């Protein structure tokens, strides 16, 4: 995911902590950051909600992190 590592590092969250909070293995987080694994829609929602950003921002499709309602 385009901005996952950036968001995680800005908030000083380890891959292990993020993985635990989201109920996944650390290796999944690592692969998402390296873009060697694609997240399913439910995972994208969970990660975007965790960082309080839109999925479009997470994927680099917009520079606006806010969720538009």
Task: Show which residues each predicted segment covers.
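A short, Lys/Arg-rich alpha-helix, primarily the initiator
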Residues: 1-10
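Alpha-helical residues within the helix-turn-helix
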Residues: 9, 20, 49
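Short, charged recognition helix plus adjacent turn
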Residues: 10, 59-69
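Short alpha-helical DNA-recognition segment
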Residues: 13-31
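DNA major-groove recognition helix of helix-turn-helix/homeodomain DNA-binding modules
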Residues: 23, 42-57
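DNA major-groove recognition helix of helix-turn-helix
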Residues: 33, 51, 59-62
């Amino acid at each position: 995911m385009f901005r996952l590592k950036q968001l995680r590092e800005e908030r000083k969250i380890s891959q292990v902590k993020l993985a635990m909070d989201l109920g996944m293995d650390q290796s999944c987080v690592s692969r998402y950051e390296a873009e060697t694994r694609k997240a399913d829609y439910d995972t994208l929602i969970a990660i975007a909600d965790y960082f309080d950003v839109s999925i479009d921002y997470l994927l680099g499709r917009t520079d606006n992190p806010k969720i538009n309602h």
